[in-house]
């Protein structure tokens, strides 16, 4: 089960298919875009049309039909007795008024053995960094954690003890929203920096 759309959601869907998933579904919070560009959406505006990228194309072919659903709000990830994902509790949304309204009586459960949350490009979670005294810039779009040039070691707010454990950041939290492959490469570089600091 992939929650979210865009390039990240498409990559999740395509990867799941290529790794042999027997069933793949994708839920999108937003309503489905039109199949054709509307007159109210002229060039040079970004075209608001339904996009079916490589991952969805592969999934549709493998699953024998459309595997996406739009206007779906995930309320809860359901767990089995061992704490593993067992499904989702979701509700359908009505966007006709220009904003999401939950449709009464539409709540239902969907089985799932793996849930991938493909909701990105929103910046780091501030609460995590607030808890360890690391400042996060908030001007404009969500920005990454402040770190020294060329380093993964995060800056600290005034008042944090000098001997406090260091905090390292990588991926979107350090560089801003980007591709998963960039975050993975940055995580490896961060791990090497930590290993060096610990003299491992």
Question: How would you label these PLM feature ranges?
Answer:
Residues 1-6:
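Beta1/beta-strand and adjacent pyrophosphate-binding region of the FAD-binding site
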Residues 8-12, 32-36, 76-78, 95-98, ...:
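Flexible loop/turn segments at secondary-structure boundaries
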Residues 9-14, 19-20, 170-200:
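A conserved FAD-binding loop/helix module that cradles the flavin
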Residues 24, 65, 69, 85-87, ...:
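Active-site lining segments that contact anionic ligands and/or coordinate catalytic metals
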Residues 78-108:
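Conserved beta-strand-loop-beta-strand element in the redox core of flavoprotein oxidoreductases
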Residues 96-177:
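FAD-site-proximal beta/loop scaffold in flavoenzymes
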């Amino acid at each position: 089960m992939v929650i979210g759309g865009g390039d990240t959601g498409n990559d999740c869907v395509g990867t799941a298919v290529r790794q042999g998933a027997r069933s793949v579904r994708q839920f999108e919070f937003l309503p489905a875009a039109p199949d054709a560009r509307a007159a109210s959406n002229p060039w040079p505006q970004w075209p608001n049309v339904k996009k079916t990228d490589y991952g969805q194309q592969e999934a549709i072919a493998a699953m024998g039909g459309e595997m996406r659903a739009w206007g779906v709000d995930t309320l809860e990830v359901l767990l089995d007795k061992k704490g593993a994902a067992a499904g989702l509790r979701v509700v359908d949304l009505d966007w006709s008024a220009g904003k999401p309204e939950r449709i009464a009586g539409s709540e239902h459960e969907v089985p799932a053995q793996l849930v991938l949350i493909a909701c990105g490009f929103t910046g780091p979670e501030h609460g995590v960094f607030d808890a360890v005294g690391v400042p996060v810039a908030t001007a404009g779009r969500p920005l990454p954690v402040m770190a020294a040039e060329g380093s993964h070691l995060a800056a600290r707010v005034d008042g944090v003890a000098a001997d406090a454990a260091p905090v390292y950041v990588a991926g979107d939290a350090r560089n801003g929203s980007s591709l998963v492959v960039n975050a993975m490469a940055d995580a490896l570089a961060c791990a090497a920096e930590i290993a060096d600091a610990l003299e491992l």
